[in-house]
Regions:
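Alpha-helical transmembrane segments of multi-pass small-molecule/ion transporters
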Residues: 1-361
Length: 361
């Protein structure tokens, strides 16, 4: 194990501290925000390059894929409803933004964190298309249900749906690296020389994964910290909401998946806790513009609502990675030694020496 692999959690925390420290520099926050999609795309490329995409099918991970999709579609909304009512009882644009981000399971860097923590990351990748499809279908359904039962303001929900077509462009940092990695793997199967070239690419991708994760964490903290700190009255409630959700969802996912293997349980737990804020943020920003155009003064708080979830989740992911690595990685299974004692009711026999036994005459 290399130096970066042994100390990656400390490197992640250090990167986040550097990003927060650089957030106050003039123009740095804006530049960092522009670079986040590219850093995310590079990180996902290195992750996808290490996976056997051409030989992967959802049938290999059917149980895991079904579990994470059903959890995201039906389990998470049951938990989100009372939490949003408790922390944001107003039901306005802030509550709507929180609901949208909490109902969207992560499909990008959750794969990276799961791999680092020792989970079954290939199963999460196989479930990615189904998680994306479930989000597109069920987020409008659940937000409408929340509005009907009084958790969200019906007027606010009615003003944002259907989602603008530009919102689907937010999937670009995910789809482009995935398709590129798949095409390169298909290309490498044509000849042994291409396979050797791809093996070198895999080796470089494995080496670059931790530095790219550090870069992404630093850029995200630098880009989003100023917007979050500007809303000092709102942040404690939002941070409490997201932290409470992460704890309850993580504990519930871990214990409800106890029939699975340890790697699958880690994957289910990470999938239940991690949200799709990087993909959802442009969508929420477009919804905020629509509400602001209609004269809603709270629309400007929707962006900070999503960004608070991002920063809170980064700390939670780093902590979860450290916990799982400390608890499970490099743990040696003790071997059961034979019992040296001999039961009293069993006759002791002399060891076999290769010669016939001597008997007294």
């Amino acid at each position: 194990m290399s130096f970066m692999e042994r100390h990656q959690v400390a490197l992640y925390l250090g990167s986040m501290i550097v990003g927060v420290a650089c957030a106050g520099l003039s123009g740095w926050s804006y530049a960092s925000e522009q670079l986040v999609p590219y850093a995310l795309g590079a990180l996902l490329w290195t992750n996808f390059a290490l996976m056997p995409l051409t030989g992967m099918s959802v049938g290999q991970y059917k149980r895991l894929a079904c579990t994470v999709v059903l959890t995201a579609t039906f389990g998470t909304p049951i938990l989100v409803a009372p939490l949003v009512s408790l922390f944001i009882p107003e039901g306005g644009p802030v509550a709507l933004a929180a609901v949208i981000v909490l109902l969207a399971p992560c499909v990008d860097y959750v794969v990276v964190f799961t791999r680092i923590a020792g989970g079954e990351y290939r199963g999460l990748l196989a479930a990615t298309p189904y998680l994306l499809g479930a989000q597109l279908i069920f987020i409008p359904v659940w937000t409408s249900i929340y509005a009907y039962i009084g958790i969200l303001d019906t007027r606010v929900v009615g003003e944002i749906f259907p989602l603008p077509a530009e919102s689907y462009l937010s999937l670009t940092p995910l789809i482009v690296p995935l398709v590129a990695a798949y095409l390169v793997q298909r290309w490498s199967t044509r000849s042994p020389q291409r396979q050797q070239t791809y093996e070198r690419v895999r080796s470089m991708s494995d080496t670059a994964m931790i530095p790219l994760m550090c870069l992404l964490l630093a850029l995200m903290c630098s880009a989003y910290t100023p917007a979050v700190l500007n809303e000092t009255q709102l942040i404690p409630r939002l941070a409490g909401l997201y932290l409470t959700y992460a704890i309850l969802a993580g504990v519930a996912a871990w214990f409800l998946s106890r029939a699975m293997s340890r790697a699958e349980r880690i994957s289910v737990t990470f999938s239940a806790v991690t949200r799709n804020a990087l993909i959802i943020y442009p969508v929420v920003a477009l919804c905020a513009q629509r509400l602001a155009h209609n004269g809603n003064p709270e629309a400007k708080l929707m962006g900070a609502t999503v960004l608070t979830q991002t920063l809170t989740e980064l700390l939670i992911m780093v902590a979860m990675t450290a916990i799982f690595r400390a608890a499970f990685q490099d743990r040696k299974i003790p071997q059961r030694l034979p019992n040296p004692g001999t039961p009293k009711n069993i006759e002791r026999r002399p060891p076999h020496t290769g010669r016939p036994p001597l008997y007294k005459l």
